[in-house]
A protein has these predicted regions:
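Helical hinge/lid and interdomain linker segments adjacent to catalytic or ligand-binding clefts
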Residues: 7, 23-130
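An acidic, glycine-rich "communication" segment
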Residues: 2, 11-20, 35, 108, ...
């Protein structure tokens, strides 16, 4: 049996914090990968993963269908559209393929795609993820809002399966862990009723 192979892009952040103390200030930097929570769980299921943290996506994310073909699925998580659109050469006024269109075409050709929600997914915080009205939105089963899509729920909420017997939920709990936020999207009319 062929091992499932995915390209997982995102779920990392470089953080700059400035401390202002009257007339004086200092800045310190840190780096974190929230991918450390999900990637081991996927690997436990026998999934082979090639991981690109956010800062590597601009230069290293595939530019051609041939580079995407080895993957059964591409996953983006907390990764805005600009990281996919702006290859470093584009910033030097050289053309490169539109990777949002490439991902759309990859899905049309039968490749899997999953966008995991986050502050830089779908529309995102202050609409900075900006996937509304892009080629990649055409491949999603939902419409991305044209404005900040966050629904913040500090009290927490638990999603429940509407149809726990649906095949896509095989092996998942009927009640999901508590979440504090989600990206609001609209199910495309041609997709029909959501099952989760």
């Amino acid at each position: 049996m062929k091992q499932t192979r995915i390209l997982f892009a995102g779920e990392s952040a470089a953080i700059a914090t400035t401390h202002i103390k009257g007339m004086d200030s200092f800045t310190h930097y840190s780096y974190g990968e929230a991918s450390r929570y999900i990637l081991p769980k996927l690997r436990e299921q026998g999934i082979e993963i090639d991981y690109l943290p956010c800062h590597d996506v601009m230069a290293k994310f595939p530019l051609t269908m041939e580079e995407l073909e080895p993957y059964d699925c591409v996953v983006t998580s907390d990764l805005g559209s600009n990281s996919l659109l702006f290859h470093p050469e584009v910033l030097r006024s050289h053309t490169k393929p539109n990777r949002l269109a490439l991902l759309r075409d990859y899905v049309k050709a039968g490749g899997g795609f999953l966008m995991i929600g986050g502050y830089m997914s779908f529309a995102g915080v202050e609409n900075k993820a900006r996937f509304h009205d892009t080629e990649l939105e055409e491949a999603l089963p939902v419409e991305v809002l044209a404005h900040d899509d966050r629904v913040e729920l500090p009290q927490g909420f638990c999603a429940r399966a509407v149809d726990p017997q649906h095949p896509i939920l095989n092996g998942l709990p009927e009640v999901f862990p508590t979440m504090l936020f989600y990206n609001k999207t609209l199910v495309k009319p041609e997709i029909g009723r959501a099952h989760v």
